[in-house]
Design a protein with these regions (language model features):
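Phosphate-end processing signature that detects enzymes handling 5′-triphosphorylated RNA
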Residues: 23-178
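Short, basic/polar N-terminal leader/transit segment immediately after the initiator methionine
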Residues: 4, 18, 29-32
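Short, positively charged and aromatic/hydrophobic N-terminal segments
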Residues: 5, 9, 15, 22-23
């Protein structure tokens, strides 16, 4: 069975929405996050919630991905691209979808679904940001990564004691490459 290049289909659809003025807010979605290895399990005591995640990729090409994610009782379709932004900023478009549709889409994904537990740890600053710490299972068992989303690339933030080496921008730590 031939499955058309899903990245090209989504890119064409997004371009069409922009042309007809339906995607004004879509093009303004920018994600700026920093990613780190985690050196201890001390973060677990600080977590305010955790959730199980399974995700797969319909498309993984240099600079762009299309991801399906089931997170608890919710599901999302996400398009990410570094081709429209500079530095560590990425274009991100996310849409909540029906979980039963997501389960079907996961069957169409490329091999190597990611299964992980995500812990949410609030920061102690006035900006009320949060750390997302992912503990990977399955073929990436033992890998633990922490991410924080920022408003600008040079925005300062407090580094928790359990934070290790920064791996932002290192392709081997992109979920799409695992």
């Amino acid at each position: 069975m031939h499955i058309p290049n899903i990245c090209s289909i989504f890119a064409a659809d997004l371009k069409m929405q922009c042309h007809f003025g339906h995607a004004d807010s879509i093009m303004q979605n920018t994600e700026i996050e920093r990613k780190f290895l985690v050196t201890s399990e001390a973060f677990i005591a600080q977590a305010t919630e955790s959730k199980e995640i399974i995700q797969g990729y319909l498309c993984k090409e240099p600079g762009k991905t299309v991801r399906v994610r089931i997170q608890g009782d919710k599901a999302f379709l996400t398009i990410k691209s570094s081709l429209l932004r500079k530095g560590i900023a990425k274009f991100e478009w996310e849409k909540e979808i029906d979980p039963s549709d997501a389960k079907e889409l996961l069957q169409l994904c490329l091999p190597g679904a990611i299964i992980k537990t995500r812990y949410i740890i609030p920061t102690k600053d006035e900006r009320q940001r949060k750390w997302e710490v992912d503990v990977f299972h399955g073929h990436k068992q033992g890998l633990v990564l922490a991410e924080i989303e920022l408003e600008s690339e040079d925005e300062p933030f407090e580094r928790p004691a359990w934070l290790g080496e920064e791996v932002t921008g290192q392709p081997q730590y992109y979920n799409a490459n695992m």
